[in-house]
């Protein structure tokens, strides 16, 4: 039985630096950074005082006052970004609602909403006991990440499978990977899938306590510097990216614009440590499995969209994994980290990086690694420093690594240049 192939026919992105895939791509292709001093709360108690904040107002982006009151910032991101349906040109009304599904990835859920509500019911933390009378009726929405999938399903009229994936920083890749499998097996006709996180609040800033985030704040624009010898942690970001996924031949029949085919996906875990990483073997295995599913040889990978968080450990771990999986071709393949420009939005970043990968093929441009001036000697691959590179891109490997040992890989190929 021939396996159904899955295409991306719609993309929408909300990221630091702009709402919309065009603004997002312009920032990446120009190598600009969106990092600044934190404005959402007073960061004085924390080592890290910079973040990549998104300029966003729900009311200015089509949400009603009632929706803004009901939804946490992350849920608002998800609903607005689910407008990828519009980009796809897909007539969802032509499909039975139960043949349309939703998968949303998120690492930390509605942390900003929870933090705000705690401040209200505790009088800014001054009360020994919280006063539940001040709790908003929709507080439950903040407590359950499943509300993200529910809000997106309501927004697009999906009555098929609807679920949330929470695998730390690989959530965005895993959410799309699971959605691809549902289309492949014929359970649905269309999936709206992606990931979201809005973690810039004191709650996720406890990452500061384990020194995962950078303390560099004297020059915010240069704070995120993956693979550089002076890197000292990542910059927290926020955002969302969502996709419309359809069976490839069906999308071609209706004349859809096809950004990419998702040809391979795999995930592994190291069963080792919550934050520690070993020698890259598990990520390398995920890469090999994704390439096998895509029926690609290592030599056919044109670009690697790295996890590239900017921690000493992760960047070296990834470099080792690429060498294990691709062999000598790793040295000939451009690798870059867009976290150098848009920060690390935890569960959302995997989907944001999938969007960047698809757009790299759309425009035949490899985005750069910003702020890479002095490469770490142990990170000795081609990390596309500072400036984007024009080159033909027919296939992209994008990878993610998450706390808990999660390692995921996805292969995108150019369906536009394939007649199969």
UniProtKB/Swiss-Prot annotation:
EC code: 2.3.1.-
Record key words, sorted: Acyltransferase, Antibiotic biosynthesis, Transferase
Pathway assigned to this chain's UniProt record: Antifungal biosynthesis; monensin biosynthesis
A Pfam family reported for this protein in Swiss-Prot or TrEMBL: ketoacyl-synt
Example of a GO cellular component annotation carried by this entry: cytosol
Top-level taxon in the UniProt lineage: Bacteria
Active-site annotation: 169, 307, 344
Biological process terms in GO annotation: antibiotic biosynthetic process; fatty acid biosynthetic process
Example of a GO MF term: 3-oxoacyl-[acyl-carrier-protein] synthase activity
Ketosynthase family 3 (KS3) domain sequence ranges: 3-414
Similarity comment: family membership: Belongs to the thiolase-like superfamily. Beta-ketoacyl-ACP synthases family.
PANTHER family documented for this protein: 3-OXOACYL-[ACYL-CARRIER-PROTEIN] SYNTHASE, MITOCHONDRIAL (PTHR11712:SF336), POLYKETIDE SYNTHASE-RELATED (PTHR11712)
Name of the protein: Putative polyketide beta-ketoacyl synthase 1
Organism from which the protein derives: Streptomyces virginiae
């Amino acid at each position: 039985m021939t396996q159904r192939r899955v295409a991306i026919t719609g993309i929408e992105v909300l990221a630091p630096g702009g709402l919309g895939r065009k603004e997002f791509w312009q920032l990446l292709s120009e190598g600009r950074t969106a990092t600044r001093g934190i404005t959402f709360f007073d960061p004085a108690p924390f080592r890290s005082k910079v973040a990549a904040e998104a300029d966003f107002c729900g009311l200015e982006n089509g949400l009603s006052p009632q929706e803004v009151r009901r939804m946490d910032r992350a849920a608002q991101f998800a609903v607005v970004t689910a407008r990828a349906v519009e980009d796809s040109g897909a007539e969802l009304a032509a499909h039975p609602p139960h043949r349309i599904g939703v998968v949303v990835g998120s690492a930390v859920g509605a942390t900003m909403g929870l933090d705000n509500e705690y401040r209200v019911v505790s009088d800014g933390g001054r009360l020994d006991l919280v006063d539940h009378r001040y709790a908003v009726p929709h507080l439950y929405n903040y407590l359950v990440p499943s509300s993200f999938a529910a809000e997106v399903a309501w927004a697009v009229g999906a009555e098929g499978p609807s679920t949330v994936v929470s695998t730390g920083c690989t959530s965005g890749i895993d959410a799309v990977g699971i959605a691809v499998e549902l289309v492949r097996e014929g359970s649905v006709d269309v999936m709206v899938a992606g990931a979201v996180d809005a973690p810039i609040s004191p709650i996720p800033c406890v990452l500061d306590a384990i020194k995962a985030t950078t303390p560099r704040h004297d020059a915010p624009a240069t704070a995120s510097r993956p693979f550089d010898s002076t890197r000292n942690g990542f910059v927290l970001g926020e955002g969302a990216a969502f996709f419309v996924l359809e069976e490839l031949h069906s999308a071609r029949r209706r004349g859809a614009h096809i950004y990419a085919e998702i040809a391979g996906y795999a995930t592994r875990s190291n069963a080792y440590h919550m934050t520690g990483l070993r020698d890259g073997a598990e990520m390398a295995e995920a890469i090999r499995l994704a390439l096998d599913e895509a029926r690609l040889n290592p030599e056919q990978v044109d670009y690697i969209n790295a996890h590239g968080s900017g921690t000493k450990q992760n960047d070296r771990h990834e470099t080792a994994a690429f060498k294990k999986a691709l062999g000598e071709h790793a040295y000939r393949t451009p690798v870059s980290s867009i976290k150098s420009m848009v920060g690390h939005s935890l569960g959302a970043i995997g989907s944001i990086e999938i969007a960047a990968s698809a757009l790299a093929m759309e425009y035949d441009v490899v985005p750069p690694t910003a702020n890479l001036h002095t490469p770490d000697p142990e990170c000795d691959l081609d990390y596309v420093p500072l400036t984007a590179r024009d080159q033909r891109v027919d296939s992209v490997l994008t990878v993610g690594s998450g706390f808990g040992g999660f390692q995921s890989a996805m292969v995108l190929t150019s369906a536009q240049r394939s007649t199969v």
